[in-house]
Amino acid sequence: MEPDGTYEPGFVGIRFCQECNNMLYPKEDKENRILLYACRNCDYQQEADNSCIYVNKITHEVDELTQIIADVSQDPTLPRTEDHPCQKCGHKEAVFFQSHSARAEDAMRLYYVCTAPHCGHRWTE
């Protein structure tokens, strides 16, 4: 990004809103047939200098997801259960979440993480 807030031609990185600093997303202006970058948080948008869009999809396995967030068992926003005790240490409480996997076979699978401080065992049922 240049000091004046513009991007060099052909820039393919992430763009940010000049109003609220959120990420800008590609958006088509169908009436004028141009590509825009628009903020999903406010009304800011800017015309793209290049009509090329690159998509980089990254998928993660549940083990990767729970290791990325080392303190997932301490997350107060995750639901907890005592109906699925840890098979490794016997602790009764676990947090659980549904993976955002795109694979159809994982669509409704729940993943559990033991909340015992010394354990952190991860499993699915």
From Swiss-Prot:
Pfam families: Zn_ribbon_RPB9, Zn_ribbon_TFIIS. A zinc finger (C4-type) spans 17-42. Belongs to the archaeal RpoM/eukaryotic RPA12/RPB9/RPC11 RNA polymerase family. Keywords: Acetylation, DNA-directed RNA polymerase, Metal-binding, Nucleus, Transcription, Zinc, Zinc-finger. It is found in: Nucleus, Nucleolus. One of its GO terms (biological process) is maintenance of transcriptional fidelity during transcription elongation by RNA polymerase II. GO terms for molecular function: DNA-directed RNA polymerase activity; nucleic acid binding; zinc ion binding. The keyword Mitochondrion does not apply. The gene is POLR2I. Zn(2+) 2 binds at residues 86, 89, 114, 119. A zinc finger (TFIIS-type) spans 82-124. DNA-dependent RNA polymerase catalyzes the transcription of DNA into RNA using the four ribonucleoside triphosphates as substrates. Component of RNA polymerase II which synthesizes mRNA precursors and many functional non-coding RNAs. Pol II is the central component of the basal RNA polymerase II transcription machinery. It is composed of mobile elements that move relative to each other. RPB9 is part of the upper jaw surrounding the central large cleft and thought to grab the incoming DNA template. Component of the RNA polymerase II (Pol II) complex consisting of 12 subunits. CDD domains: Zn-ribbon_RPB9. GO terms for cellular component: nucleolus; nucleus; RNA polymerase II, core complex. This is DNA-directed RNA polymerase II subunit RPB9. PANTHER family: DNA-DIRECTED RNA POLYMERASE, DNA-DIRECTED RNA POLYMERASE II SUBUNIT RPB9. It comes from Sus scrofa (Pig).
